[in-house]
């Protein structure tokens, strides 16, 4: 029967020419299979906000479409690639209470043939608590599929004495593809200056169905920030903003925890940020320290962001950090918003950074 140990042996025999980093990639894959799975941590959480909390659906724009690409551990053969497409819509109906969203996410590892595809539908309800404070509550229902492509491996019993490959393996390949349903919820309390986000993903802890019936553990998060304006944008079409926004967050999933704190500075049309992350991994691995550098550009309804994770610890530095690129198309009618403001029917503009 195939287990994580034989999987490592298969990878090692199949790619004996790798340098040490290649074997490390295989060990990481085997660890991921034999331990509870983890969700990807995006370095531009406000660009990928629907992934972080369904209550962000419809919070920033009348509608938006965002494409995110993340290449993690680029120094390893194949690395770990995440591609995400997110879209949300807040219909212009009386009260503007409702918003809908769609989230498509794919994780894959080129070294091990591992892929995980998740498709989610989101709904958020928005309401004003006072003239200056509003609340958004959201729900997320996702369908996921996880699989391993065995044609990426060469097992020991396939290697003849002269080093050639001979026939299929006799290993029992029992990591069948797994389908699962995941439920999540969240809330965002916000004003035009600050926000507090609370979210829980995978509340039903779906089984991933691999050999040990491992579960996808709950992801719990709490984050927030406050924006200080030097130049505050007006209600018209032509606006200019100069501001700085300190942010902080706590995240926990399975045996992994993460805390972070950072600062974003916006001088229209450019946003720059730096976020420190302290990550505690399961299995007795030492704390990993990262510094995330973010740079974004806004031009009309287009947003383009790039970030790089700089490893401050030995392991994270050896793995090469992560590159992340986001491209967003969004629409927000400032004139209509000004009209609603005059009639006291407007919500506060959420002050979260764009990236």
Model-derived regions: residue spans:
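Cleavable N-terminal export/targeting peptides
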Residues: 1-39, 332-355
């Amino acid at each position: 029967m195939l287990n994580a140990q034989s999987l490592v042996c298969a990878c090692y025999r199949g790619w004996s020419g790798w340098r040490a980093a290649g074997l490390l990639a295989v060990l990481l894959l085997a660890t991921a299979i034999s331990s509870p799975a983890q969700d990807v941590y995006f370095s531009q959480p406000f660009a990928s906000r629907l992934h972080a909390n369904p209550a962000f659906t419809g919070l920033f724009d009348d509608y938006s479409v965002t494409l995110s690409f993340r290449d993690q551990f680029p120094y390893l053969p194949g690395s770990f690639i995440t591609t995400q497409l997110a879209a949300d819509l807040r219909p212009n109906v009386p009260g503007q209470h409702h918003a809908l969203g769609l989230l498509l996410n794919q994780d894959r590892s080129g070294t091990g043939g591992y892929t995980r595809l998740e498709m989610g539908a989101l709904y958020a309800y928005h309401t004003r608590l006072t003239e200056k404070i509003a609340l958004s509550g959201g729900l997320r229902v996702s369908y996921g599929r996880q699989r391993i492509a065995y044609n990426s491996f060469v097992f020991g019993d396939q290697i003849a004495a002269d080093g050639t490959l001979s026939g299929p393996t006799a290993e029992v390949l029992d990591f069948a593809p797994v389908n699962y349903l995941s439920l999540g919820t969240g809330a965002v309390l916000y004003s035009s200056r600050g926000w507090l986000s609370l979210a829980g993903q995978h509340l039903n802890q779906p089984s991933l169905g691999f050999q040990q019936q491992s579960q996808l553990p709950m992801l719990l998060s709490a984050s927030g920030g406050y924006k200080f304006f030097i130049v505050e944008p007006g209600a018209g079409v032509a606006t200019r903003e100069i501001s700085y926004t300190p942010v902080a967050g706590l995240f926990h999933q399975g045996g992994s925890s993460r805390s972070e704190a950072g600062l974003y500075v916006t001088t229209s049309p450019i946003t720059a940020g730096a976020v420190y992350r302290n990550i505690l991994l399961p299995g007795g691995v030492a704390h990993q320290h990262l510094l995330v550098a973010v740079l974004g550009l806004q031009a009309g309804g287009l947003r383009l962001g790039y970030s790089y994770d700089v490893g401050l610890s030995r392991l994270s530095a050896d793995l090469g950090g992560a590159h992340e690129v986001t491209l967003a198309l969004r629409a927000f009618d400032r004139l209509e918003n000004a009209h609603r403001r005059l009639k006291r029917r407007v919500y506060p503009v959420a002050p979260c950074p764009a990236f």
